[in-house]
Design a protein with these regions (language model features):
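N-terminal beta1-alpha1-beta2 module of alpha/beta enzyme domains
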Residues: 1-71, 179, 294-297, 301, ...
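N-terminal small/glycine-rich loop or linker at the start of catalytic domains
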Residues: 1-18, 74, 115-121, 160-179, ...
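Active-site mouth loops of central-metabolism enzymes
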Residues: 9-25, 82-90, 177-187, 255-272
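Short, acidic/polar
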Residues: 21-34, 92-95, 184-197, 251, ...
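Internal, glycine-rich beta/alpha segment that forms the wall or movable "lid"
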Residues: 79, 88-198, 212-218, 229-230
Length: 322
């Protein structure tokens, strides 16, 4: 199992009162350090408002990833995830194809259907019910799959939420056979079926105890359509707000005060350590963990601790085979 790092962008208020240029420079500093320390992949996510409101600095993920593609030359890059509610799928595919060129074939295109109604309202996007948002995501996956696959014919699709007609996309993908497509989520009915039909990877957000059941259902969804379950990579997403036993968050807890009080009051046996969780996921055969690390805006120290935990858990770091 490999180690991916979710970079801070400001969604958790990490850059409150920061100059935006300094915030950008700090993100690049962290990305370069993570690459040197053996991180396999760097990830950004799509939020357009900070989690708890306010006017803190928050940087947009696609343009930030374009900068990362230039500034950080070796590690893989990905999204956890783009919000299809905000996006035209054909334009998303075109942007992804361009990013794959800029990065020399290092992009994983992560897609989801969004969950924050306040963000949609603020930007004037319609926030559909969950069932409809997932249907929209399915249509986006169909169009994008056609557009980012090398040597495919022009994309053509007519749906309820999106339509393209004989659409040529050049370049399509530096990678072969296509840009890898990731879906985020843990819904066993719709999300898992979309993963089986369209995706190269699914990024789950479940704890170690629930992982085996999720993988069992994923295997069923693949088998329903005649796909070998082993061809669908399974990874885990760990937000920086997730609490671990023995980890204080490096000065930025990424939680509301009431959440901090709840975690601090928990018994040591109620929470696994990060090493224990990562080792469990590795033993269950997951492809990678994609983790946020609290406190990175303020200090490099939490990143070094994270790297140590990854190594102790037996994760494969760049330049090392496990």
């Amino acid at each position: 199992m490999k180690a991916g790092l979710i970079l801070p962008q400001g969604w958790f208020g990490e850059f409150e009162s920061w100059d935006p240029i300094r915030a950008y420079e700090r993100i690049i500093e962290l990305a370069k350090l993570a690459e040197r320390l053996g991180i396999e992949s760097l990830w950004t996510g799509e939020h357009v408002l900070t989690k708890w409101g306010g006017e803190q600095v928050l940087l947009e993920c696609v343009t930030l990833t374009a900068a990362l593609a230039v500034e950080v030359p070796r590690v893989e890059l990905g999204f956890t995830v783009l919000n299809s509610t905000f996006r035209n799928p054909a334009l998303t595919a075109k942007m992804a194809s361009t990013l794959d060129v800029i990065s020399r074939g290092r992009l994983t295109l992560g897609l989801g259907c969004g969950f924050r109604e306040d963000e949609a309202d603020a930007f004037g996007y319609e926030f559909l019910p969950t069932k409809q948002r997932l249907a929209l995501l399915g249509e986006h996956l169909e169009i994008i799959s056609q557009m980012v696959t090398a040597d495919a014919p022009p994309a053509d699709f007519t749906g309820e939420y999106a339509t393209v007609r004989q659409l040529v996309n050049n370049p399509r993908s530096v990678q072969r056979p296509r840009i890898p497509i990731l879906i985020g989520g843990h819904g066993p009915n719709v999300t898992f079926r979309l993963a089986a039909k369209y995706c190269d990877e699914i990024n789950l957000d479940v704890l170690p105890a629930a992982t085996a059941q999720a993988r069992s259902v994923l295997a069923q969804r693949c088998e329903e359509i005649g796909r070998d379950p082993h061809t669908l990579a399974v990874s885990i997403s760990v937000p920086p707000s997730l609490a671990w036993r023995g980890l204080d968050g490096g000065g930025q807890r990424m939680m509301r005060p009431d959440e901090i009080a709840f975690v601090d009051a928990a018994s040591a046996t109620d929470l696994p350590s990060r090493v224990e969780a990562f080792a469990s996921w590795r033993e269950q055969g997951l492809s990678r963990v994609v983790a946020g690390v609290p406190g990175l805006a303020l200090s490099d120290d939490p990143l070094y601790t994270f790297i140590d935990d990854c190594r102790e858990a037996g994760l494969e770091m760049a330049g090392q085979s496990t």
